[in-house]
Amino acid sequence: MSRSSKKGPYVDIKLLDKIEAMNKANEKRVIRTWSRDSTIFPQMIGHTIAVHDGRRHVPVYITENMVGHKLGEFAPTRFFRGHGGKKADKRGKVK
């Protein structure tokens, strides 16, 4: 179920404060965050945000097309390595 439209989009307040402070100071640096559920706002365009995927922080450069989406959409948490079998064993070996 999606969020109620009367509540508005969610964004972590600390993350938004960091973005606004960087916009005022006109600086660009990577911001680490664990807030995968935060919505991307227009103020975030041009910044790089390192989103936690459960193991490490994945750098995500914010563009105009990403506005309205969630940060977690751009940092996948699961990686498909393929099904088992003889062919998979040969492909998976590191020489």
UniProtKB/Swiss-Prot annotation:
Coiled-coil boundaries: none
This protein's UniProt keywords: Ribonucleoprotein, Ribosomal protein, RNA-binding, rRNA-binding
Gene Ontology MF annotations: rRNA binding; structural constituent of ribosome
Biological process, per Gene Ontology: ribosomal small subunit assembly; translation
GO cellular component terms, semicolon-separated: cytoplasm; small ribosomal subunit
InterPro entries for the chain: Ribosomal_uS19, Ribosomal_uS19_bac-type, Ribosomal_uS19_CS, Ribosomal_uS19_SF
Taxonomy, superkingdom: Bacteria
Cited PANTHER family: RIBOSOMAL PROTEIN S19P FAMILY MEMBER (PTHR11880), SMALL RIBOSOMAL SUBUNIT PROTEIN US19M (PTHR11880:SF8)
Function in brief: Protein S19 forms a complex with S13 that binds strongly to the 16S ribosomal RNA.
Membership in a protein family: Belongs to the universal ribosomal protein uS19 family.
NCBIfam families: rpsS_bact
Name the UniProt record assigns to this protein: Small ribosomal subunit protein uS19
Organism: Chloroflexus aurantiacus (strain ATCC 29366 / DSM 635 / J-10-fl)
Upper classification of the organism: Bacteria, Bacillati, Chloroflexota, Chloroflexia, Chloroflexales
